[in-house]
C-alpha cells in the first residue's frame, strides 16, 4: 500500500511546491510594483489598504522610514 501512495504523495508535493513558488513570485512582483510607483500605492490605498499597511510595515522594519509620510503628503496636496 505504501508503494501505491508514493506517486500520489509526490504529485501532491509538487503541486504544493508549485503553488508556493507562484505565491512567492506574485508577492515579490506586487512588492516591487509598490516600491517603485507612488501612484500604484495610492491605488492600493483605495482598493486594498490592508496590503499597503503590510508594505509600509515591512519597509519600516527594514529601516526605510518616511515613505508613508511622503505618500500621505503628496496625496493630500494633490486633492487640494
Swiss-Prot record:
List, alphabetically, the GO terms of the cellular component aspect. Answer: mitochondrial membrane
Question: InterPro entries annotated for this entry?
Answer: CEBPZOS (IPR037764)
What keyword terms does UniProt attach to this protein? Membrane, Mitochondrion, Transmembrane, Transmembrane helix
Query: Where does the protein end up?
Result: Mitochondrion membrane
Query: What residue intervals traverse the membrane?
Result: 15-31
Source domain of life is Eukaryota
Extract the coiled-coil ranges from the record.
none
Q: How does this protein sit in the membrane?
A: Single-pass membrane protein
Protein name, entry field: Protein CEBPZOS
Q: Which species?
A: Mus musculus (Mouse)
Gene symbol? Cebpzos
Amino acid at each position: 500500500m505504501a508503494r501505491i501512495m508514493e506517486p500520489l504523495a509526490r504529485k501532491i508535493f509538487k503541486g504544493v511546491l508549485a503553488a508556493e513558488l507562484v505565491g512567492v513570485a506574485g508577492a515579490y512582483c506586487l512588492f516591487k510594483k509598490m516600491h517603485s510607483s507612488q501612484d500604484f500605492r495610492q491605488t492600493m490605498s483605495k482598493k486594498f489598504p490592508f496590503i499597503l499597511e503590510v508594505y509600509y510595515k515591512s519597509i519600516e522594519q527594514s529601516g526605510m522610514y518616511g515613505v508613508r509620510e511622503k505618500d500621505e503628503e503628496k496625496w493630500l496636496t494633490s486633492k487640494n
